[in-house]
Amino acid sequence: MARKPASSQDFETTLAKLENIVAHLENGDLPLEEALKEFEQGVQLAKLGQERLQQAEQRIQILLQKTEDAPLNDYKGNA
């Protein structure tokens, strides 16, 4: 039975589930209805993974922009 992806799962879990579904589908031994359910869940997981990547990219862009707005000063250690 196909599972619904949890929106709170992390990217690595999503990717592992997607890879598992791809492996099942590549075997080619699933009945049509089960293959369609697996494919549907795979599409949902791919979308969720893409959203996670976009969120990470946005966070990185925000951090980089903050760095550009506040340039780093030379470090003067305890010399």
From Swiss-Prot:
One of its GO terms (molecular function) is exodeoxyribonuclease VII activity. The keyword S-adenosyl-L-methionine does not apply. Its main location: cytoplasm. Disulfide bonds: none annotated. It catalyses: Exonucleolytic cleavage in either 5'- to 3'- or 3'- to 5'-direction to yield nucleoside 5'-phosphates. It holds the Pfam family Exonuc_VII_S. Bidirectionally degrades single-stranded DNA into large acid-insoluble oligonucleotides, which are then degraded further into small acid-soluble oligonucleotides. Belongs to the XseB family. HAMAP family: Exonuc_7_S (MF_00337). This is Exodeoxyribonuclease 7 small subunit.
